[in-house]
């Protein structure tokens, strides 16, 4: 379990970026696989989700998850609906005791909190979602709801590190076409190109005017017993992979 020091200061919320330890899954999913979309046994995933939620709430669990699509779509949860299928990549709420969850396996989980309005968001940002502007859309929604940028606190959770995120030339060209300033997120070593996802997201948050940003510098690729990693599983020839979960709620 990893916590943001900046968010930890605020007692009206609870959060956690969880790793794979402590669950009941076995095999390639060993530990706390929370991915409903994985090929793991459904009963194990359900048990793991309950265990994860109890890390931040001992009371009745109301957990909202997404059908994540690497998009820039978000949902503002005003009324709790357990059966609703939320399709997109960000959740926002002001409701108390409602846990927002994001699943990742190399992509970045992001939390945003307005300390005055008591508004929270959980964002799933892989390169596609970040490129499409999911972070910008969520921040704009906060502002529309009355947030002042100086009151926003953001935390970027564990994701794949730059040294393990090799990309192709077409990938880099796509980002440079967006703006040549994106070149700073790429590094060239031994004829290979590497991309920094968390740095790219950090600079987006800064450009939007958020100054209080925490980067959890934990690599999901290595070591293998700490987090689930889609890229590592593919490299090892595994047919599937587990998902890490990140949770945030207003008390």
What does each of the following model-derived ranges do?
Residues 1-251:
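Active-site microenvironment for binding and transforming phosphate-containing groups
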């Amino acid at each position: 379990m990893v916590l943001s020091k900046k968010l930890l200061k605020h007692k009206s919320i609870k959060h956690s970026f969880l790793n794979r330890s402590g669950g009941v899954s076995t095999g390639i999913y060993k530990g706390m696989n929370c991915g409903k979309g994985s090929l793991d046994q459904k009963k194990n995933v359900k048990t793991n989700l309950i265990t994860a939620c109890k890390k931040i709430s001992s009371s009745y669990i109301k957990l909202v998850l997404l059908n994540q699509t690497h998009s820039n779509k978000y949902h503002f949860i005003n009324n709790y609906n357990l059966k609703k299928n939320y399709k997109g990549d960000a959740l926002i709420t002001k409701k108390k005791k409602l846990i927002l969850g994001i699943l990742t396996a190399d992509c970045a989980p992001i939390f945003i909190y307005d300390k005055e309005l008591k508004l929270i968001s959980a964002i799933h940002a892989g390169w596609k979602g970040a490129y499409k502007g999911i972070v910008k859309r969520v921040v704009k929604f906060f502002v529309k709801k009355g947030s002042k940028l100086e009151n926003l606190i953001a935390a970027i959770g564990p994701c794949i590190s730059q040294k393990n995120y090799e990309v192709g030339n077409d990938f880099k060209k796509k980002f440079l076409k967006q703006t040549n300033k994106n070149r700073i997120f790429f590094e060239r070593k031994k004829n290979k190109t590497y991309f920094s996802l968390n740095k790219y997201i950090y600079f987006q948050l800064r450009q939007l005017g958020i100054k209080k940003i925490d980067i959890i510098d934990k690599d999901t690729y290595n070591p293998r017993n700490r987090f689930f990693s889609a890229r590592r599983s593919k490299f090892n020839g595994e047919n599937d992979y587990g998902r890490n979960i990140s949770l945030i709620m207003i008390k």
